[in-house]
């Protein structure tokens, strides 16, 4: 049995998802005015005033650690929300799987806590 006809709608979607952005960028390239880059275009924007100082600032690593921990637990929330919405229909096995998922994330949180990733000092 050849299953390719079952995937026709998927291939059409894939084709349209590829063609529409290329078409939009091409039309924009041909219709947009051709402006040259002046010195104003090359400066950074700071609330409508002339920029003062260097635009490249180094951030401390602790900001990245907080951001990483936040993203991990934000993704956890995204995964747990659909599960919570269909909790009654899924049964005991889905509940156990969700508990294992949360337990693994708690282990990660304890590890980050013990390593000092959550300390602000």
From Swiss-Prot:
TM stretches of this protein: 10-30, 65-85, 90-110
InterPro entries per UniProt: NAD(P)H_OxRDtase_bac/plastid (IPR023043), NADH_UbQ/plastoQ_OxRdtase_su3 (IPR000440), NDAH_ubi_oxred_su3_sf (IPR038430)
Enzyme class: translocase
Gene3D superfamilies referenced in this protein's UniProt entry, alphabetically: NADH:ubiquinone/plastoquinone oxidoreductase, chain 3
One of the record's GO cellular component terms: chloroplast thylakoid membrane
Record membrane topology: Multi-pass membrane protein
Localization of this protein: Plastid, Chloroplast thylakoid membrane
Keyword Metal-binding listed: no
Any one Gene Ontology molecular-function term assigned to this protein's record: quinone binding
PANTHER family xref list: NADH-UBIQUINONE OXIDOREDUCTASE CHAIN 3 (PTHR11058:SF9)
Family: Belongs to the complex I subunit 3 family.
Subunit record text: NDH is composed of at least 16 different subunits, 5 of which are encoded in the nucleus.
Protein name per UniProt: NAD(P)H-quinone oxidoreductase subunit 3, chloroplastic
């Amino acid at each position: 049995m050849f299953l390719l006809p079952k995937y026709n709608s998927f291939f059409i979607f894939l084709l349209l998802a590829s063609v529409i952005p290329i078409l939009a960028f091409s039309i924009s390239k041909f219709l947009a005015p051709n402006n040259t880059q002046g010195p104003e275009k090359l400066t950074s924007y700071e609330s409508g005033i002339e920029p003062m100082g260097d635009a490249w600032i180094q951030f401390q690593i602790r900001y990245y650690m907080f951001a990483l921990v936040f993203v991990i637990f934000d993704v956890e929330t995204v995964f747990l929300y659909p599960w919570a919405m269909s909790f009654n229909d899924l049964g005991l096995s889905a509940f156990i799987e969700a508990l294992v998922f949360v337990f693994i994330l708690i282990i990660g949180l304890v590890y980050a806590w013990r390593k000092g990733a959550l300390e602000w000092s």
